[in-house]
Amino acid sequence: MLRIVKKLWVILFISNISINSFAKNIYDNVDDANYDSTQYYENEGSLLFKMRLGGIFASAKQKGLPTHSSIQAVSVGEVAKNGYGGDASTTIFFNNYLAAELSLGFNVLRTKYTSLAAVAHNYGVDNVKLGKHKPIYMIPATLTGQFHIAPYGGIRPYIGIGYHGSYMLTQATGLKIRNGYNIVGQIGVDFYAKDDTLINMDVRQFFLKPKLEYKPNLVGNKKVTSKVKLNPLIVSIGIGFTF
């Protein structure tokens, strides 16, 4: 029993010396630290300019098409495929956590001519010549309020919610698309490379249901309209600069 007690005392003594030595080293390191050289990025009052490129994922399902008179009707399907685009944005920080981002984008969605041919078959002129594929252009102006979850250090995630108005345009044969507007959700992260330079990864979900109108050269003298559930998801990567 006495032997065990002696061993315990030896262990405690050695442990005490080790802890004291470790604590002294930490204290010395704190004293010697140069905080002026430590990377520390402050958001408050700054402006952030970003440029991004990305891919677009859209469903483009149509709703509200009128009842057709075709005996051998075919499924209309989606009117557009996935696409690509880019945007430029300016972010102003009200404090380290809250910011507002204003962005202007230019996006391209590829039309599915099988859908246009199906509309022509069901409602109007069969075997219509559709010509070359013409895309749908989406030009959104977006204002987003952001909350920066961890605003210090080199990695800064954020979330946001806002509103967009999108100018829609296409030169596709027999198709006209109206402008749209709705809410947009956002999540992203900034990777700071230097004090004023960063890499940005951003995901935005646009909610958008523009109105489609089919022209007489596709459907004859009938009035055929529908709502398309576009709801594009835009995944982007880009660079940014603070001012």
From Swiss-Prot:
SUPFAM superfamilies: OMPA-like (SSF56925). GO terms for cellular component: cell outer membrane. GO terms for biological process: transmembrane transport. It is found in: Cell outer membrane. InterPro entries: OMP/PagP_b-brl (IPR011250), OMPW (IPR005618). Residues 1-23 form the signal peptide. Keywords: Cell outer membrane, Membrane, Signal, Transmembrane, Transmembrane beta strand. Gene3D superfamilies: 2.40.160.20. The keyword Membrane applies. Pfam families: OmpW. Its main location: membrane. Belongs to the OmpW/AlkL family. This is Putative outer membrane protein RP075. It comes from Rickettsia prowazekii (strain Madrid E).
